[in-house]
UniProtKB/Swiss-Prot annotation:
Gene Ontology biological-process annotations: translation
Gene Ontology molecular-function annotations: small ribosomal subunit rRNA binding; structural constituent of ribosome
GO annotation, cellular component aspect: cytosol; small ribosomal subunit
Keywords: Ribonucleoprotein, Ribosomal protein, RNA-binding, rRNA-binding
InterPro entries: Ribosomal_bS20 (IPR002583), Ribosomal_bS20_sf (IPR036510)
Keyword NADP: no
Full protein name: Small ribosomal subunit protein bS20
Transmembrane feature ranges: none
Gene giving rise to this polypeptide: rpsT
Family matches, as NCBIfam families: S20
UniProt family annotation: Belongs to the bacterial ribosomal protein bS20 family.
Function: Binds directly to 16S ribosomal RNA.
Length: 86
């Protein structure tokens, strides 16, 4: 454990940031599951609607470095290809 006051503050800040990032990653996964659910149900309109929301979230959080840019691109391309198959 850190003894210096600034180090203790940095640890608490890092913990807050980690919790924030985990919640945002969880939100991305939840929207991805919703899109996959509508793809499985063959509901193209709702799948596209949730895909656009998912796409904006992924783009926003990839720019903030919460997820990697290549991972964001991979998520979007996989989902869009699945939507096209409906």
């Amino acid at each position: 454990m850190a003894n210096i006051k600034s180090s203790k503050k940095h640890i608490s800040i890092s913990e807050k940031r980690r919790k924030y990032n985990c919640s945002k990653r969880s939100m991305i996964k939840t929207f991805m599951k919703k899109v996959l659910f509508f793809i499985k149900e063959k509901n193209r309109i709702k799948a596209i609607k949730f895909f656009y929301i998912f796409q904006s979230l992924v783009d926003r959080y990839s720019l903030k470095k919460i997820i990697h840019i290549n991972k964001a691109s991979r998520y979007k391309s996989v989902l869009m290809n699945n939507i096209k198959k409906i």
